[in-house]
Amino acid sequence: MHLNSSVPQGTPGEPDAQPFSGPQSEMEATFLALSLSNGSGNTSESDTAGPNSDLDVNTDIYSKVLVTAIYLALFVVGTVGNSVTAFTLARKKSLQSLQSTVHYHLGSLALSDLLILLLAMPVELYNFIWVHHPWAFGDAGCRGYYFLRDACTYATALNVASLSVERYLAICHPFKAKTLMSRSRTKKFISAIWLASALLAIPMLFTMGLQNRSGDGTHPGGLVCTPIVDTATVKVVIQVNTFMSFLFPMLVISILNTVIANKLTVMVHQAAEQGRVCTVGTHNGLEHSTFNMTIEPGRVQALRHGVLVLRAVVIAFVVCWLPYHVRRLMFCYISDEQWTTFLFDFYHYFYMLTNALFYVSSAINPILYNLVSANFRQVFLSTLACLCPGWRHRRKKRPTFSRKPNSMSSNHAFSTSATRETLY
């Protein structure tokens, strides 16, 4: 990406450096759309935006091809993985008892990830990577695109957090979990997540809109999907979005998964040191209840595996989403006077990197969450084999092990199947 030589060398945003007519300076006009996570700016090649386009924002062809190849790979992996996950959870009745109600959370997460890939990635590739403007989908398409993208982003983050809450209750408070995590309550909770996500995304319907920023205001090449409110309002929207779709979910995920990992680690150590017997306890007011449970060697290995998966979940969420939100917050906290040509170029390519990581999150979630349950993984691969006959021949045969029921003693009636639901 480079700026045209015709761009004045003074401070970005000065009145004499206006590529388009309108209230924003050149940097404001460019970064308003960039900072809302979708776009390479409101400016493009001078021959398409009108005679007064002094700012040329170009991505070199090699970067475009590389980003396109990465996006296509993520699109294939993500859509196949999330589609098969959703299909598996909806059609396979053998999963109705999978990890208590965790299959509802997995299904909701797969749906939000799938919608992000289907709704956001194609539009971004076309109108923000290859053809900066004119915007090709009209004013309704502009508002609807940002609304749906933000709603699905909120839903993904909140679904990951809700899955952590479900696992925390199931592992650390198994008695309460049986009461709190009923199927009907879980369905209502997930419905509330989607409703909250839609409500949180409503501001995008009024923040974004179609404007013509060509010199005379009529050139068709100057149509851009851009913020139609003042810069201060845009910054508020960005910061609220960052808090609700990243900081808050990350705090919940990090705390709960740390507690879960520590609990599983203690259980593994107890099982290894005390003859495969671990103790699970719960508090109910003044009453303290405990039960001992014998765990087989295979189950101990599964517990160790569960600890690693939980750590991977936290790391993946932070690695994929932190750069994305850091890049957006750059717009909020870097003043116009601090933007240089070098920083502008860095921002543009940093945009492509962070958005690629953002889509990695949607593509990798099926892999991470399929690792949580061996039962789910088995049914997932079985479904994939049915949908893709060629996959059946590539699957390696794995030895099967017979498992004896877990034995336990407790002052509460607690079934073996219920106990298995609290463990990975």
UniProtKB/Swiss-Prot annotation:
PROSITE patterns: G_PROTEIN_RECEP_F1_1 (PS00237), G_PROTEIN_RECEP_F1_2 (PS50262). It is a multi-pass membrane protein. InterPro entries: GPCR_Rhodpsn, GPCR_Rhodpsn_7TM, NT1_rcpt, NT_rcpt. Residues 90-103, 166-185, 261-308, 370-424 are cytoplasmic. Interacts (palmitoylated form) with GNA11. G-protein coupled receptor for the tridecapeptide neurotensin (NTS). Signaling is effected via G proteins that activate a phosphatidylinositol-calcium second messenger system. Signaling leads to the activation of downstream MAP kinases and protects cells against apoptosis. This is Neurotensin receptor type 1. It comes from Rattus norvegicus.
